[in-house]
């Protein structure tokens, strides 16, 4: 159960807790409203790309967003027994095509060094930033961009 913080005052409570999907949804809504007002673009759209086997089981999936002239990939996963079969590349191609159709000129994605940075490089993505020591000492969070 979340506990009030010692910094509580008469009018407010600071509460530290675990994951909260309701709070996440509210924060997203509030930030979207602020961002849309700031830049004059409100065409943020989420998308997904997935691969299923003949039994309807998930083989691979990708989720992301488009907004204005930019697209971003949030998550990519390929089932272990289906890796090295080209599904990741096909999902990237489908994502890039969708982003172009929505008027995007660039696509952003991040990958930890123990995940798939070389995969993105092979598909034409360029590293533009790197944060060392994340999420562990011997790893890094690598940020990529691809011009569409």
Placement of each model-derived feature along the sequence:
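Conserved GNAT acetyl-CoA-binding A-motif
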Residues: 99-113
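Acetyl-CoA-dependent GNAT
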Residues: 12-74, 79, 114, 131-133, ...
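Conserved active-site tyrosine of GNAT-family acetyltransferases
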Residues: 27, 120, 125
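Conserved catalytic-core motifs of GNAT/GCN5-like acyltransferases
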Residues: 108-110, 126-143
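Basic/polar N-terminal segments that are highly enriched at the extreme N-terminus
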Residues: 1-12
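Conserved short alpha-helix immediately C-terminal to the canonical SAM/SAH-binding motif I
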Residues: 91, 115-116
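Conserved acetyl-CoA pyrophosphate-binding loop and the N-cap/start of the following alpha-helix
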Residues: 82, 86-94
């Amino acid at each position: 159960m979340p506990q009030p913080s010692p910094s509580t005052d008469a009018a407010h409570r600071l509460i530290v807790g675990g994951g909260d999907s309701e709070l996440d949804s509210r924060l997203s809504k509030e930030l979207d409203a602020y961002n849309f007002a700031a830049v004059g673009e409100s065409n943020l759209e989420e998308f997904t790309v997935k691969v299923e086997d003949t039994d309807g089981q998930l083989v691979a999936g990708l989720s992301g967003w488009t907004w204005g002239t930019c697209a971003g990939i949030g998550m990519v996963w390929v089932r272990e027994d289906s890796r090295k079969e080209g599904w990741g590349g096909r999902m990237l191609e489908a994502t890039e095509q969708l982003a172009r159709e929505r008027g995007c000129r660039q696509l952003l994605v991040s990958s930890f060094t123990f995940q798939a940075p070389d995969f993105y490089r092979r598909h034409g993505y360029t590293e533009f930033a790197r944060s060392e020591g994340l999420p562990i000492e011997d790893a890094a969070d690598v940020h990529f961009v691809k011009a569409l």
